[in-house]
Amino acid sequence: MADVLRVILLVALAAAALTTGALVLNWWMEPVRRMRRALLKSLGVTPEAEALSPAEGRAAGLDFDGAQVAVLWNRGSAGLVYAFEEIEGGEIIVDGHVVARVRRGEARKALDLMAPEAEQVVLRLMFADARHPEFELALWDATLPVQTGSPGEALRLGRRWLSHLEALLKG
């Protein structure tokens, strides 16, 4: 009888250990956490501004002290790091229409539209790179099965990114 109880306890302990291991692995591989780790690895420091699209597997982060911007795709497994001098500008695109723009040497096209019913809000970053001249990141996409945030929050994040880019391009 003691052996049966011992076996039952060992099986229960093994099941608890496996469950705990699976939960820790699931937590570690969570898309947002994984993208933040990839940004940290590519920039070398925690980004001071970040934009994440876990459903697309894309992210962008700014490091002001290191004067660099990182753009990642393929769930953070691929990406590029650009110096601030290589940034040409950025745009906010709502449902296929450019609603705000910042470009080197041009006046800013201010965001004068708040679209609470937008289907898609995209941040496009433009670089002086012939191979990868632009990077698009969906800040909001109504077609995705899981929604986080709202179109208004996405527009505010995009406007904040354009403000950062404008300050970098002027400075």
What residue spans do the PLM features occupy?
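Anionic N-terminal interaction surfaces
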Residues: D3-G76
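Short, isolated positions within intrinsically disordered regulatory regions of eukaryotic proteins
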Residues: P31-V32, S77, L144, L165
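Generic detection of short hydrophobic beta-strand segments and adjacent strand-loop junctions
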Residues: L52-P54, Y82, F135-L137
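A generic structural motif
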Residues: D63, E88-E91
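Short coil-to-beta-strand transition motifs
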Residues: S77-E88
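Acidic, Ser/Thr- and proline-rich intrinsically disordered linker/docking segments
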Residues: G90-G171
